[in-house]
Amino acid sequence: MTVSASRPRLLVLYHFFHPDRVVSARIFSDFAAEQAARGWDVTALTTNRSLDDEAVRYPAEETWNGVRIHRVFRPAWTQKRPVPRLGNSAWTLAAWFARAVQLGPFDAVVLGSDPSFAASLAIPLRAAWPRTPIIHWCLDVFPDAGEAEWTGATRLLSPPARAVMSAAYRCCDVVVDLGPCMRRRLEAYGGSPARETLTPWALVEPDAPAPADPAVRRELFGDAKLGLLYAGSMSRSHDFESLLALARACRARSGDDVAICFACTGTNLPVLKAAVRPDDTNIRFAAFADEAAIQRRFEAADFHLGSLRPDFTGIVVPSKFFAALAVGRPFIFAGAPDAAIATWTRELDVGFVLEPGGADDVAARLAALAHEPAQMQAARARAFAAYRSRFAKRIINDRWAALLARMRAGRPTPTG
């Protein structure tokens, strides 16, 4: 296959892709479609398995929004345990390399970070296409993300995994991170690739902040004057203890006027529910919503909550921050004060950073806002403006297009 003289060819690789609905799959699918609309001939390599149900298999090939999708076969091994997940990674990366060589050459390659160790594919791709720009868009840092849950014999994988990933990052022309903390982790692996920060965007981007639906707000927060929503995943990487401390500080100061609703799923949800006491009357739970209800819930809240354990700082970045700002809702982040979300929250004045021991201070600010609707409206306006000017899908994809154009201009056209 020869490279098109009229449209440069871009290869995008990610474990899950359209029509999967998980956030990262939709981000990579939208990215591929956006670059196709900007003039690239885009090929996506993914797998034939659904994230939600391994028994569901997608067609081997499909064209969607100008993107040619090629799905390699992957066994129906669970993604919920480390060893089968590593098996899925090894299988998928080997199948991808074989298919990529058949489909290539390309003018540029963008590698995601799923499956685990996906960036290691840069090593054989660099050998096969020494002059093709390889870009790694890192949504999760490996092996750091894996080490957080490896136990027993799997911990022995850490030294060789770090050696492999160090070699992989060195094979990339550009490593795209999600913020300064992630960049510092990636820089520790050595090498001298170019560095860029390009964040994900919100899946829903309304034209203006919408008022809350009274019925949805009552369902989530009862009669509270201020509603704080934690929506999404509650996994090992998330710190719910700080959020419980905030809820209790709010109740001590304002009674039930400030309510927190957890509408989430994940491995830590049962632990969170067990930690809630009978006197936590301003803490509520709601079932995890389907996509049709998510935007109404997001708009029903006054603030959105996010958390990240300090040891996960720089490994992942909570995407709910972007979703909250997109609907014009400020954010409260519980995590390390130097985390990217904390830095942006302070820099853009779009919420509060909940540091250890800081629950009373944030509770006092919330109590004041509960009686200051004009200030709350101003906070919403700042959040919405920050998203539109800094994190919107159009802006991020324009920056991606500029990066791809620069890389193509700096590399000869691949020949095989």
What are these regions, as identified by a protein language model?
Residues 1-67, 174, 245, 250-253, ...:
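N-terminal subdomain of nucleotide-sugar transferases
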Residues 220-238, 243-248:
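Conserved donor-binding/catalytic core segment of Leloir-type glycosyltransferases
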Residues 133-135, 144-167:
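Nucleotide-sugar donor phosphate/pyrophosphate-binding loop at the beta->alpha transition
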Residues 225, 254-255, 261-264, 269-295:
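Nucleotide-activated donor-binding/catalytic signature segment of Leloir-type glycosyltransferases, i.e.
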Residues 162-195, 204, 400:
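A short, active-site helix/loop in glycosyltransferases that binds the activated sugar's phosphate group
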Residues 238, 290-297, 304-325, 330-343:
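Nucleotide-sugar-dependent
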Residues 120, 124-128, 155-175:
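Membrane-proximal helix-turn-helix segments that form the acceptor-binding/catalytic region
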Residues 215, 357, 361, 373-405:
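A charged, aromatic-enriched C-terminal amphipathic alpha-helix characteristic of glycosyltransferases
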